[in-house]
């Protein structure tokens, strides 16, 4: 908390893949945008900070353990957050799930009063935790996460069911148990029942309003 900026509220939402992080982030974004204006709030996804693998052949890229902390450039993410807190715009990288590497495009992100950051391993990184005003962990059962992940990755990311299940068994579940679930201890708020938990959403919105006024 020592590295936070009172003029910029950063909310970190962590938890297993397909636990409801993106849904609750979008819901809070949409509802607070209607209340405060779209120039006041923005969402950043940890997936954008997967490390560039363009120097590797595709056969090597697909072997990467994407659920391990080493797959992410958390140092760049932390630096971008610090720049945004200082009132400077940043160029966020974009990532291709089909190519397993970053694209050539970036997204210009201007400073906001509220930044919602969502990703599986946010609370595992001590440098990122220090930048968060509120840290949240989505405590959704793994079997529900797997069903959601299957539907998402097959329908939206062009994956096959077999490849999704193989990845889940080899890396997703083991990395959840090793890195993601233990990071729950750092959460200020633990949210059960996924991204449609209205009580949790209203509580978060109330907390954000309080931080903006304090």
From Swiss-Prot:
Q: What is its EC number?
A: 2.7.1.48
User: Where in the sequence is the signal peptide annotated?
Assistant: none
Example of a GO MF term: ATP binding
Picking any one GO biological process from the record gives:
UMP salvage
Top-level taxon of origin: Bacteria
- The residues that the entry says bind ATP are 15-22
One Pfam family from the record: PRK
Enzyme type, top EC level: transferase
What pathway or pathways are given for this protein in its record?
A: Pyrimidine metabolism; CTP biosynthesis via salvage pathway; CTP from cytidine: step 1/3; Pyrimidine metabolism; UMP biosynthesis via salvage pathway; UMP from uridine: step 1/1
Q: Name one GO cellular component term.
A: cytoplasm
Protein name per its UniProtKB record: Uridine kinase
Organism field: Tolumonas auensis (strain DSM 9187 / NBRC 110442 / TA 4)
List the top taxonomic levels of the source. Answer: Bacteria, Pseudomonadati, Pseudomonadota, Gammaproteobacteria, Aeromonadales
Q: Report which gene this protein is encoded by.
A: udk
